[in-house]
Amino acid sequence: MQLPPALCARLAAGPGAAEPLPVERDPAAGAAPFRFVARPVRFPREHQFFEDGDVQRHLYLQDVIMQVADVPEKPRVPAFACQVAGCCQVFDALDDYEHHYHTLHGNVCSFCKRAFPSGHLLDAHILEWHDSLFQILSERQDMYQCLVEGCTEKFKTSRDRKDHMVRMHLYPADFRFDKPKKSRSPASAEAPGDSGERSEGEAMEICSEPVAASPAPAGERRIYRHRIPSTICFGQGAARGFKSNKKKTKQC
């Protein structure tokens, strides 16, 4: 398609040309009834032209403010306790109870009763803490999986996993990733047995013959305060139980 010469000249002249393009009209149509020329019109802010827009804007802002101010209240119900055995939490809103249940009772280890915020952490805990084959397999291959759900990386040790989470997932370095296992030394392992035997022996000695009470150290003599009246005496060979404080009058 070939463009008119005037249009080609207009395009070649660039944006600086201000002359309008010629419009060819059909001679049979006659002269144009009107001629439209665009010109800017400025209205003041309080002009009637903006009245409808101001009303709509005011209603819109009022509706937004009402929605922000009127925070929906949680449906209140009679206070009820958590249904899990051993939990004494009391709630008066269903949302609070659902949050409590999913946080503390939704993912609980059946072995040690520890609660976890997600099923992924619960599975990792059971695998690392309660699986007897985990330690054997960890010596041959990477078994410590990343604690971030969706990450499939596995590592040789828990320290390597922590470095990965700090470096790749931007976790804080002092974040408590996993609770370290407490290693019991041989001395501490033998201590309960010795103490058990000692306590059993002491119990047998106590049953056979009474053990004298150890005397109080010097300077720390115990002071006992009894609320029993001095006129009442207990024990074998004691004076009569009720003794009068009145002195006997001697008869001349």
Swiss-Prot record:
UniProt entry keywords in alphabetical sequence: DNA-binding, Metal-binding, Methylation, Nucleus, Repeat, Transcription, Transcription regulation, Zinc, Zinc-finger
UniProt-listed SMART domains: ZnF_C2H2
Highest classification ranks of the organism: Eukaryota, Metazoa, Chordata, Craniata, Vertebrata
Record function comment: May be involved in transcriptional regulation.
Organism: Homo sapiens (Human)
Name of the protein this chain belongs to: Zinc finger protein 511
GO-annotated molecular function: DNA binding; DNA-binding transcription factor activity; zinc ion binding
Presence of the UniProt keyword rRNA processing in the record: no
Region (Disordered): 177-221
